[in-house]
A protein has these predicted regions:
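Short, well-structured alpha-helical interface segments that form or flank functional binding sites
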Residues: 75-78, 93-95, 122-125
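Intrinsically disordered, glycine/charged-rich C-terminal tails and inter-domain linkers
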Residues: 1-2, 9, 135-207
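Catalytic-core segments of nucleotide cyclases and related cyclic-nucleotide turnover enzymes
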Residues: 107-131
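Catalytic/regulatory signature loops of cyclic-dinucleotide turnover enzymes
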Residues: 100, 122-147
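Aromatic- and glycine-enriched beta-alpha-beta binding-site module
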Residues: 82-97, 129, 137
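Catalytic phosphate/metal-binding cores of nucleic-acid and nucleotide-processing enzymes, i.e., regions
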Residues: 66-67, 125, 148-153
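A short glycine-enriched loop-to-beta-strand structural element that forms part of the catalytic core
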Residues: 54, 58-62, 92-108
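Catalytic NTP-binding/metal-coordinating core of nucleotidyl cyclase/transferase enzymes
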Residues: 1-85, 89
Length: 207
């Protein structure tokens, strides 16, 4: 799916496979995870009108192209939800950080033996840094929106995007739930399962 050049303010998501370093201890398992991640991302973006992106190693970069800011946010949340739901079916969890700001995609630069996408902009950098070293540390399965630089939005009409605990820097998107009334029970199950590491987290996300 070719991506045309883009330059403007939009929402950008940085997503990666949780626990990929552990998966890399077995080349076959790591390769299977990567292949499924890429295929899932390709299928979701192919069927999504307003979100584009690409995947490199264990990471994906998504951005919304058209519409007002509310539409852009809803579009990227929907894509993230679909990718996460398909990944969790194979017991793979993702972490996803979303930011708003400038984003510049300059197409594909081709060199012999390698392909590189030129991407620049505050939104991409902010999403990447939040995913890698944001505080509190993002946990497996989580998708969160960085509040810094957010435009005016009608958050009340996105009931599964909420503030969480004492974290004043983010809003969390509960992609796996259907009703905000389920959030409190999920959080309890997630905390209780954390000691079981990834197996327990997967069970909580699937419940």
């Amino acid at each position: 799916m070719p991506i045309t050049d883009f330059n403007g303010n939009t929402f950008v998501a940085f997503t990666d496979i949780s626990g990929f370093k552990e998966l890399m201890k077995n080349d076959a398992i790591a390769l299977e995870a990567i292949k499924y991640f890429y295929q899932t991302g390709f299928n979701v973006l192919r069927d999504t009108d307003n979100v584009e992106g690409f995947f490199v190693s264990d990471c994906g970069i998504l951005f919304s192209r058209n519409g007002d800011n509310q539409t852009k946010l809803l579009s990227i949340l929907d894509a993230v939800k679909k990718i996460n739901k398909r990944m969790i079916e194979r017991n793979y969890m993702l972490t996803t950080s979303i930011s708003f700001g400038s984003f510049d995609y300059q197409g594909k630069i081709e060199f012999q033996g390698i392909e590189k996408n030129a991407i620049y902009g505050g939104a991409y950098v902010q999403s990447f840094l939040d995913n890698e070293m944001g505080k509190p540390k993002i946990q497996p399965g989580q998708c969160r929106l960085v509040k810094q630089n957010l435009p005016q939005l009608d958050i009340e009409n996105i009931p599964l995007l909420v503030e969480r605990g004492n974290d004043i820097q983010h809003m969390y998107y509960y992609w796996h739930l259907e009703n905000p009334k389920e959030i409190q029970n999920f959080e309890k199950n997630y905390r209780d399962s954390y000691s079981l590491k990834y197996a327990g987290m997967i069970n909580a996300l699937k419940s």
